[in-house]
Amino acid sequence: IGIGAGYLFKTTFQREATSDLTGERGSLMGAIEGLLEAQYEVLREHGHSPSEAFNETVEELTQSLMPLFAEKGMDWMYANCSTTAQRGALDWAPRFREAIKPVMEWLYLSVKTGNEAQISIDSNSKPDYREKLNAELKAMHDMEMWRAAETVRELRPENEVK
């Protein structure tokens, strides 16, 4: 039995470990970080301000679209977005899938063969693991994209000074 998102589901240890590690490195964390950073960088390289690039990359995703997606699914989210968003998403999704699927296959194989578990074991076993992790997290925190996040979050209605 696996536990996920507040419910139980039937699985095996091998399937749960494989899907869990693939998900964490893939769409749940690693891939989403890479995707968001790539889009942010492209917008910045083409003259968009940090706040604008962050808003169009992360803020709208987390504040507007993901709640719709979580509530009733991708098709419902599409049906409740602008026509330009609908058409663009439907046209571009296959291109992203074609570009990303080979990386996901490579990742899955790396997980299935135990390579990803070994990387984690080796990394987590080093005496300076925590210091290196903190340095990596600080580097992420200090990126322009995440500094812009602080500015954009201050603009949310719930953060408005009354």
Residue ranges with predicted function:
Residues E45-K162:
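NAD(P)-dependent Rossmann-like dehydrogenase/reductase catalytic/cofactor-binding core
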Residues I1-Q63:
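Internal alpha-helical scaffold of NAD(P)-dependent oxidoreductase catalytic cores
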